[in-house]
């Protein structure tokens, strides 16, 4: 796989009144060509600062950023402007020109790049069709829904045929149904146009719906990185557990007693009656503390937190049984949910 974005040792701080605020601290990141790469974290983790450093909307303090084989930090202003043509970007707030039509908004980057008007219009109409807004070329932003505005922003970001599209919380202001439609469009763009996409989000559902790889950012550092399925199956950090299991699991009140086990299953296993099988085969009951299912890249995944019996022999029978089923499971330590 070819690396298209390589970040090493990236750090960025801001003056926060009496003390310096560290937004990024020694961040390493690798994105491969063709990825839909997610960066997820809680508010204030440094996500937006990271994505804005990639095209130098923010200037890093330390570290290297290699994009398309170029050291972005070494470029002068003229060279940077040329490099940015290969890096499209969309934002939460759309940033459309309110007094310009959809067609005029999409044409705008090409006007700046001194395209001929006829060529710019042809390209804009192609992209407006791609994002599903044919027939609305003359409409203005005030006449559009939030989802439509984001589609215009996506079309505008693609005008100069970038190899990379950066999405900074691009679905955060949208309702769930509209979010799914925008993510479906991004997946289409990735597949049909070969655009590598980086999605910044605080929503695990966005990662599950669209991404093949993910980094988890916490308190200015990358704490986990890998394929979405692997991170989902084996979260190693507290923040990953919190993001994957969700708030419901985080507030589960555990009763004192037996060991707690996290069970993860996918594909056909997601529909197997695992708890009933445990009871029948091990002659012992478990206490379900939390359970949910979700779909990642078209595959149904499920997970449970269960509490085993106090009786050590019964608990061991269950662990032995689970080992034989091939289901992914791990014993959870106190405080890890």
Give, region by region, the residue ranges found by the protein language model.
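ABC ATPase "signature
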Residues: 225-226, 234
